Amino acid sequence: NPAVGWLIPQPWVIDADGDRVRFDDIVGGHWTVLHTGTDAAAGAWRSAGVPVLRIAGPGSAPGADRIVDRDGTLLRWLEDKKTSVIALRPDGFVYAGGTPQRPLPPPPAGFTAQANRVKDHA
């Protein structure tokens, strides 16, 4: 997948509470799966304790499992990388990616996210 190995951008996003925050304030330091639509292939990651978040476009409503890409930076980046779902490492680099035609690979055998949750920045 063309996104693998790249450092993801750090734009402003809208969190579940409707606050404008840096993307890293939400996912920084934790494994996270991000997707642009369906997260069907992310089930194995979720079972391993990894949060799964949808990236919604500008003007969308935020939610518990959805962040809003304020200016479309993340969505454009994913489109440029020809991917719709990624597994993001704690350091912000893309570990794995997928598309509807090539689903996101599962985590490595035995992988479990330790005390992994999206940051509570309230």
Task: Give residue spans per PLM region.
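Helical substrate-recognition/capping region of FAD-dependent monooxygenase/halogenase enzymes
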Residues: 1-122
